[in-house]
């Protein structure tokens, strides 16, 4: 399969890239890419100790500790409220069955946090909420049938990568920026990369963006999205690049609800039974290098690699 390493010299309508040949999605390709590599990078609990937890009390104690640590989740942990994850933590599921249920994880006023290889089911608020936080990587999780947002990022958070997650049977998938009136905190922040995520019959917010610029949405698979794919609103600048949209009438647009249009540049997206989308304006340059899969092959790569059971 052909892939391009893009060195991101994007201006409004220009992108420079070099081309290399790589076989197929592999563990090497599952390494951190995108905005999570910026601002000093994201290493989570690397270099610290490791603890395995299998009940809520042990998980909460480990999550709030001030030590650099990897927390391995075994089995199902049912939370009675949103649980805060402190800085310098990796939270990773063991195998493919590790599950967070009842409530979700709150990355608040933290930095250097990784969340990987977890199932999230039947959450009452958000499955993963990120606010006032930087250097966060959310990777290879499976999220299904929750109440509010699956992965919401807001309130001046910055330098975040959201990759290889599968979201299914859910309404509000990914919010970036929570309010049109929060520009005082959010301008110059909310820079997030979304890549290789699988949106399986979901409804909206894939993502819905305010203020972040540049936000990079690439190599995701949208299958049967019912309301809309990507929305750029309220001063945002979003590059929608080389995604695979299938049976998605409204793949991307500018403006949403009462929020005014942001900028959106769409490039080389692969459309199957989908609309053409709406784009306009300019987006700031992408500052990092990244692996870009063949656009027509994204469905195969993502459905084979997204969700739990691939890492951890």
Task: Describe the function of each predicted region.
Residues 1-70, 275-312:
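Extracellular "leader-to-stem" segments immediately downstream of a signal peptide or signal-anchor
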Residues 38, 43, 78-83, 232:
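Short aromatic-glycine motifs in intrinsically disordered, low-complexity regions
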Residues 60-67, 75-92, 98-117, 121-134, ...:
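Extracellular beta-strand-rich solenoid/capping regions of secreted or surface-exposed proteins
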Residues 88-94, 111-122, 132-147, 157-178, ...:
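Right-handed parallel beta-helix
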Residues 104, 126-127, 150, 173-175, ...:
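Structural detector of coil-to-beta-strand junctions
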Residues 107, 130, 154, 186, ...:
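Residue-level marker of regulatory loop/turn positions in helix-turn-helix DNA-binding domains and
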Residues 209-213, 218-222, 226-312:
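Extracellular beta-rich repeat passengers
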